[in-house]
Amino acid sequence: MTFLQLCQRLRAECQDIGVGPASVLSSAPRDQIYIQAIREAWLEIQLLRPDWTFWPDDLSYTLTAPQSLAVDTDVPFIPEQYHVAIVYFALGQRALSASSTELVEKHNQLWSRYYSMLTDRYTGSVIVGVSPMPTSNNDQYSVGEILAQ
């Protein structure tokens, strides 16, 4: 989805009357609400975790230089199946601004689903309870013994 399509999708998810924005360069106040929400959501998602592995190989965007959406045809660099995650993240901001409990609930349910998919795919594996045991003269020490030394 393009930046413009993401903005239009957010407006539809918010069940706002009408269509639009027609362009992300629109200066209409109502359009700017959706444009800014999508722009900020994508920046926040990129900066949400320092261990994301979705950054492009060419290093065109990084944690210290994230992608900013600016024109209608800009496309977030993550695979298209995850683009709607940006919409659902932005929906949370809009839901709070509109004081809509229905939209807050929709945001909570859908963003948590997409966040789980993103973290499953774009963060490293977590291994719990496995650590190498240091040896000394071929003797193994327990963690408690190591801490006592």
Residue positions per predicted region:
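Conserved short "hinge" loops at termini or chain/domain junctions
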Residues: 1-78, 120-130, 135-149
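Short, solvent-exposed positions on alpha-helices
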Residues: 32, 102-105
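Surface-exposed, low-hydrophobicity beta-strand/loop segments enriched in small/polar/acidic residues
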Residues: 85, 116-120
